Every structure is written in C-alpha cells, then in structure tokens.
Amino acid sequence: STHCISSAASDVYKRQGIMNKETKRKREEMDYTIEEKEMFMREALKEAEFALANDEIPIGCVLVKNGQIIGRGHNAREELQRAVMHAEIMAIEEANQQENSWRLLDTTLFVTIEPCVMCSGAIGLARIPKVIYGAKNQKFGAGGSLYDILTDERLNHRVEVESGLLEEECAAIMQNFFRNRRKK
C-alpha cells in the first residue's frame, strides 16, 4: 500500500518536473538580451513621441510575444476624450485583437513610465507575466513606487517587474513635457 502511494507521488513529481521545465522554457523565451530590451523600449519611446506630438502626456508602450510586437499604444486621452486611453490599455487592446484572446500569456510589456493603478489592474487581468518600465511614477505608480499592485501576493496574478530600462530617456521626455506645459 505504501509503495502505491510512493509510486503515485513519484508520478505527480515527474509531471510537475515536466511542467516546471515547460514553464522554465516559456520563461526563457521571454528573457530578452539587454540589446533586445533596449530596442523594444525605443519602440515604446517612439509611441511616447506620438503622444507628445498630439500634446498628450508622453507615455508609450509595446507588448511583445516571441520577439514580435503584437500591440502598441500611447496616451490618447485628449485626442479621444476618453479617460482610460492610456498607452498600456491601447497596447493591450491591440494585442487582444491580434491574438484573438484576452489572455496575453508569454508576453512582455515595455512601457516608458511605471504603470498606474488602472493599467496595472488591466495588466493583471490580461495575465501579462512580465513588465519592463523605464522611469518611476512617484505620483501614480502602481508597479512599486506608490503602490505595488503588479506583485501583490494577495492577487491571483503576479507580474515580474523590471525597472530602470533607458530610465534617463524615459524620464526626460516626461520632464520636458511638464516643464513646457508650466511655461504656457
């Protein structure tokens, strides 16, 4: 009888080992080199430039799966007169359509500024496993600065977070925008 339990437990452990290898393989597919990460963040910065050209708060975002951009977004609240039109929301929406799924598993979201509470919630709901952002958002950040929604253990989906990628460039576009806005 003990042997059967051990054998059954052994089978479970073997299956878990296989699942762990599969999970590890998937995670490795999302581990980009620093050059690749910088390339994707530069694409997010291009999106921020689009926002800036439209006199929007210059935040940009790209969502990447298997090394391909599947969603892009930039702030468009003023243009569309919709409060929820943040860069992350637009990128998630585009990726949902591209993938024909609300689940954006095996993706990495690159955004120039730390996501706010709303966007962090959307990231969790979309099951995005990894977020890489440029500069912290001390006033609205929900990825570790003001709040920590992305990694909160009380929630059923936690996100791996990296910060500080091209931080100076990401912060500079925001600082210049607000400096110029105060002059008006």
Give the location of each predicted region.
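Single conserved hydrophobic/aromatic residue that forms the stacking wall/gate
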Residues: 1-16
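Small-residue (primarily alanine) positions within well-ordered alpha-helices
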Residues: 9, 44, 48-51, 61, ...
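Zinc-dependent deaminase
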Residues: 20-54, 102, 115-184
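A short, polar/acidic, helix/strand-boundary loop motif
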Residues: 34, 77-78
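Short, basic and Ser/Thr-rich N-terminal targeting/leader segments
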Residues: 55-59, 105
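Short beta-strand scaffold segments in enzyme catalytic cores
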Residues: 59-67
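Short beta->alpha transition motifs characteristic of CBS
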Residues: 70-77
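Helix-adjacent hinge/juxtasegments
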Residues: 81-85, 89-122
